[in-house]
Amino acid sequence: MSHFPTLHILILVIANLQIQCFAFVSQSRGFCATGPPTESLKAEYRRLSALGSQSYNPVDSESRAAITPIVIDTWFHIITGEAGTELISDEMIADQLSYLQNAYWNATISYRLQGVTRSANDTWARNEDEMAMKTVLRRGSYRTLNVYFHTDLQASPNAGARAFDIVRRELGVSQQQPTSMLGFCTLPDPSINASSPPSTYIKDGCNVLAETMPGGSLAHYNRGGTAIHEIGHWNGLLHTFEGESCSSDNEGDFIADTPQQSKPTEGCPAQKDSCPELPGFDAIHNFMDYSSDECYDSFTPDQVSRMRSMWFAMRDGK
């Protein structure tokens, strides 16, 4: 008897499993490749934590009015392949900026768009030759936010995103094969000062997959939440699950009012508690978790205080 039908069925089953794995991965924001904080940055987090949370209620209008507004000069760089120059519309750019303003409004942080550049370059669209790209495109000083929206953002084989190994393991992807990701961003660097030459911070900024912009094609991640998440890193925030441990030795994200969390969130569950022996549920609605866009809605008061403290300590005047 021929074994062809059995082999054919097996191939279909394997193909279906691969599709399911891709679907599983697409429900997880495991593609943020922002690296861990340096020891000097950890020391700054500890210093700020020791000072305690500022008396600030982000919902209280009087509290908001009493503090100095932070206005961040911002550049958006739209980078497409040569055959996809129409993929990112002006409406998508405007909607992303609007969401950015709304997400940080309670922190009294706003973003003053200085301009938008558009580049059609297949290499840059994949984030290859990043140094050359940013040397040409980057604008402003260390206090200026530059966001690069790539239509085909890729991770190098050495990138540090948590989900890359999961993807490769499940799908049998070669370690040499580049993997798509949602974004990454630089954390503040304590070594940068007002006299630092631009060459020392040329890579500063956020790289974001353009499909995650409002109206993009990536289901569950096309409301603009990835840019909010990545810019949170630029403002000095870590993942809510930093350290991925429930251990008392884990300093986590150095934020007092985010419950300890050992695993990133996938999708938008009704509730999740990855450290059940510790107080609080996982912050599934927090912009610094890995939840899907429909789940995102807030930063905590201590995260707000941390971003503001980091701005004045690390970026203002530089």
UniProtKB/Swiss-Prot annotation:
<dbReference type="GO" id="GO:0005576">
    <property type="term" value="C:extracellular region"/>
</dbReference>
<keyword id="KW-0479">Metal-binding</keyword>
<dbReference type="GO" id="GO:0008237">
    <property type="term" value="F:metallopeptidase activity"/>
</dbReference>
<dbReference type="GO" id="GO:0006508">
    <property type="term" value="P:proteolysis"/>
</dbReference>
<feature type="signal peptide">
    <location>
        <begin position="1"/>
        <end position="23"/>
    </location>
</feature>
<feature type="disulfide bond">
    <location>
        <begin position="268"/>
        <end position="295"/>
    </location>
</feature>
<feature type="binding site">
    <location>
        <position position="229"/>
    </location>
    <ligand>
        <name>Zn(2+)</name>
    </ligand>
</feature>
<keyword id="KW-0964">Secreted</keyword>
<dbReference type="Pfam" id="PF05572">
    <property type="entry name" value="Peptidase_M43"/>
</dbReference>
<keyword id="KW-0378">Hydrolase</keyword>
<dbReference type="InterPro" id="IPR008754">
    <property type="entry name" value="Peptidase_M43"/>
</dbReference>
<dbReference type="InterPro" id="IPR024079">
    <property type="entry name" value="MetalloPept_cat_dom_sf"/>
</dbReference>
<feature type="glycosylation site" description="N-linked (GlcNAc...) asparagine">
    <location>
        <position position="193"/>
    </location>
</feature>
<keyword id="KW-0645">Protease</keyword>
<feature type="glycosylation site" description="N-linked (GlcNAc...) asparagine">
    <location>
        <position position="106"/>
    </location>
</feature>
<feature type="glycosylation site" description="N-linked (GlcNAc...) asparagine">
    <location>
        <position position="121"/>
    </location>
</feature>
<keyword id="KW-0862">Zinc</keyword>
<keyword id="KW-0325">Glycoprotein</keyword>
<keyword id="KW-1015">Disulfide bond</keyword>
<keyword id="KW-0482">Metalloprotease</keyword>
<dbReference type="GO" id="GO:0046872">
    <property type="term" value="F:metal ion binding"/>
</dbReference>
<protein>
    <recommendedName>
        <fullName>Extracellular metalloprotease AO090012001025</fullName>
        <ecNumber>3.4.24.-</ecNumber>
    </recommendedName>
</protein>
<keyword id="KW-0732">Signal</keyword>
<feature type="active site">
    <location>
        <position position="230"/>
    </location>
</feature>
<comment type="function">
    <text>Secreted metalloproteinase that allows assimilation of proteinaceous substrates.</text>
</comment>
<comment type="similarity">
    <text>Belongs to the peptidase M43B family.</text>
</comment>
<feature type="binding site">
    <location>
        <position position="233"/>
    </location>
    <ligand>
        <name>Zn(2+)</name>
    </ligand>
</feature>
